[in-house]
Every structure is written in C-alpha cells, then in structure tokens.
C-alpha cells in the first residue's frame, strides 16, 4: 500500500505436498519476477509441507484455504507468510475467530478473498447474482468480523470472471475504505482470452491508482502469468525495468521480415 510498488503474485500449479516440485516452480517464478506466491492447502499433508517449502524459497508464501479452517491453523504454525480465507466457505464466526487468534499471535496477515463463484447464499438471494455490490458487502462483513477481534493486518480481494463486475467492485470498495487491495480477474480462460480480460480489468484499476498486488490468472503455465503481469505494469507506467519494444504493425511498405525480427528480439529480452 501507500507509495510502495505494486507487487506481482502467482499461484503454484503443483501439488503442495510435492515439496520438490513446488519449490522448483516457486524458484523458477521468482527468478523471472514473481514477488509473492500462493499455494493450495487442500489437506494436512499440504499443510505439513509448508515448513520445508518456506526453508527453500526467497519470496513470501501464501496459504490458500477453503472449507477447513484447521488447515489455516496448521499453516500458521509452519511459517506461512500470509493466509487467504474465502468468506464464502470458511465457516462460522468461531472458525474465523480461531484463524484470527493464531494470525494475531504470529503476526501473519490475512487476505479476505471474496470470489463471485462462491458467495454466501444470503448475498446471492439478496442481489440475485454475484454483483459488484454483493462482492463488496461480503468483504466488509468479514473485515468487520476481523476488526471485532482487533485484527487489522488485512488485505482484500474481490474477484469475478466478469471484468466490469471486478472493476466496479474494486472501485466501490476503494471509495469506502483504504485497506490494501489484491486485484485480478479470475478464471479468465486460455492465454489469448485471459490476457485481454486481465489487461482490461487490472490495467483500468492500476490507471485509477487502485491495486497493491496483482495476479494474472491464466489456464496455462504460471510463468506466463508473471510475464503478463510485468507487461501490464509496464503498460500502466508502474514498472520501469525491462525493455518496451516499439514496432510497426507492418503493411505493404515493409521490406524485411519484421515480424520474425521482433519475435526474436522479444524472446531475447523476455527476462529483462
């Protein structure tokens, strides 16, 4: 938040319990510019693997928790950097309180990760479908719950697979509150489609000055997510590293293989 740089996040596609594969993927992503990495914690074996993973990586590790709050408690005991909980499936107040207590004790931030595909039933009944207002209401309900127990080390995400909904939710939230925001369009699909949705959604918010961390969600290798995130930040004027390639779209006046040349240059400079 504040004057800090917008950070790039991705998520491992490996089973977290496979420590070697997960560590290898995290370090590969970190080498090309990933600054925060999230892993799925589906069961106790995933939670138990966290300590070994943390000891072999150099960037913060976030535990993605759904349904079973006890996995958040186990992750917190094993050196996790942040815990993401989903308000739509984490359970009742007593379970949230248990997560808050351990995170407060160990100084672990919590991300309230609202998702349009898993909103609480009462919000769906109230709004009819996952509207921007429904996403924001869910976020504030859980912010108030965490604040009730004196917990403020929180960031929020309100993701939707519909770009206008995600953008409207982030703008509405920011107009009412200044908690840090993690932004991204979820379930965007294959690379070409996903890049367009993410550039529109994330890019428009970044140009508004909204967003503290970003993730480009693609049905592809997470490496492509990191490259895309870097390009979005550069296009928004928020990342100065690397090279901005300026090239003609070509027309009948072109006398060289410009497309081939540009592709060679792009490949050579991709990791800059």
Give residue spans per PLM region.
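Catalytic alpha/beta core domains of metabolic enzymes, predominantly
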Residues: 115, 123-272
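Alpha-helix-loop-beta-strand connector modules within alpha/beta enzyme cores
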Residues: 44-65, 98-110, 172-181, 265-270
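Structural preference for beta-strand elements that scaffold enzyme active sites
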Residues: 5-9, 36-38, 58-64, 81-84, ...
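Hydrophobic or amphipathic alpha-helical targeting/insertion segments
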Residues: 70-111
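N-terminal amphipathic alpha-helix/helix-capping segment at the start of soluble metabolic enzymes
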Residues: 1-11, 104, 261, 267
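Active-site mouth loops of central-metabolism enzymes
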Residues: 2-21, 40-42, 59-67, 88, ...
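Glycine-rich phosphate-binding active-site loops on the catalytic face of alpha/beta enzymes
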Residues: 33-35, 78-93, 185, 208-222
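Glycine-rich, proline-tolerant flexible connector loops at the mouths of alpha/beta enzymes
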Residues: 13-19, 30-57, 84-92, 153-163
């Amino acid at each position: 938040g504040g004057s800090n740089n917008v950070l790039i996040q991705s998520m491992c596609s490996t089973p977290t319990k496979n420590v070697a594969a997960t560590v290898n993927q995290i370090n590969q992503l970190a080498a090309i510019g990933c600054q925060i990495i999230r892993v799925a914690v589906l069961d106790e074996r995933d939670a138990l693997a966290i300590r070994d993973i943390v000891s072999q990586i150099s960037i913060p590790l976030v535990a993605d928790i759904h349904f079973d709050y006890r996995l958040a408690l186990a992750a917190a005991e094993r050196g996790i950097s942040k815990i993401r909980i989903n308000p739509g499936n984490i359970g009742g107040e007593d379970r949230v309180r248990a997560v808050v207590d351990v995170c407060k004790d160990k100084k672990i931030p919590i991300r309230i990760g609202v998702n349009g595909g898993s909103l609480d039933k009462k919000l769906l009944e109230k709004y009819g479908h996952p509207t921007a207002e429904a996403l924001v209401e869910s976020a504030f309900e859980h912010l108030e719950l965490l604040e009730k127990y004196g917990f403020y080390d929180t960031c929020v995400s309100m993701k939707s697979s519909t770009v206008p909904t995600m953008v409207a939710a982030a703008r509405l939230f920011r107009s009412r509150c200044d908690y840090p925001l993690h932004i991204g369009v979820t379930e965007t699909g294959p690379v070409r489609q996903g890049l367009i949705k993410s550039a529109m959604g994330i890019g428009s918010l970044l140009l508004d000055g909204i967003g503290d961390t970003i993730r480009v969600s693609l049905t592809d290798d997470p490496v492509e997510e990191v490259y895309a995130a870097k390009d979005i930040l550069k296009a928004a004027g928020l990342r100065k590293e690397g090279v901005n390639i300026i090239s003609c779209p070509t027309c009948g006046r072109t006398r060289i293989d410009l497309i081939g040349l540009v592709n060679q240059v792009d490949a050579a400079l991709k990791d800059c």
